[in-house]
Amino acid sequence: MKKILLPLLLVGILIAGCTPSTKKTNTLQEFFSYTENGETLISAHRGGKSYAGYPENCLETMKYIKESIPNALFEIDVASSEDGVLFLMHDSSLERTTTGSGRVDQKDWETLSQLHLKDDFDSITDYQIPLFKHVLDWAKKENAILTVDIKRSVDPELVLRFIEENDALEQSVIITYSMETAQQLYKLNPEVVLSVSIRNTKEFDTAASAGIPWKNMVAFTGTIESDPSLYAKLHEQGVMCMLGTLGNLDKKAKARGDVLYKEWTKLGIDVFATDRPLEVKKAISK
């Protein structure tokens, strides 16, 4: 019996070794696939800001926003310390958002970890600079989606690899500012979802010929309204349209009425990148 079983076992091992493994598909591709009458999404710029006591790029702020908007997206900025630790920070210097001073990339993590964050009103909070890893861990636990803005001093490949190592690809949309960067990241991982600037017909054509499938893209259509025909073309390809209302358009809505957010959805906007996530949620829910 043993003589018979051993060859069978060896055959089984060989068959298993020759069977191609099934590659896991990134579920974000389906999540960001445009569907007519789909739910409008809200992305909190810099993880949420503009609220007293809640600093930008702060994990506690994201938790606060998520309580009111369970499916909120969080745009975060990823920087690196002098000793190569990834953490959340928008500015190249520390003065505006922390109790520290000097250049971010000239401080080691031990120094940075001692600082406290300041809110938009220059009030010092009890909150501290979050590690990128801790934010990824939180996003996985809470099923949150991050849109990752990589600072110029940081290599995009390094950030992608860090996301992969932490098994957080399904929580991360990587923001790109050039088609070359988008192509580089897609080549490194064909499952990655990318935010790509498509603000006009020329950029649409560039994206269409870039060799990146539409399913890997979310279209950032800029910080001003585009011609609705652009939104329609993107929707035909199954691509969701993100409008950056942060800055001027948020100010316009605050002055003229938050009903403007509802009007922008009618033009074809699927995602708002905003400094006013709670107000946008209230406006589009009416």
Task: Describe the function of each predicted region.
Residues 6-7, 50:
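General helical structural elements
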Residues 7-16:
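Bacterial N-terminal signal peptides
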Residues 18-286:
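Phosphate-group recognition and catalysis centered on beta-loop-alpha active-site segments
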Residues 1-4:
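Positively charged n-region of N-terminal signal peptides that target proteins for export
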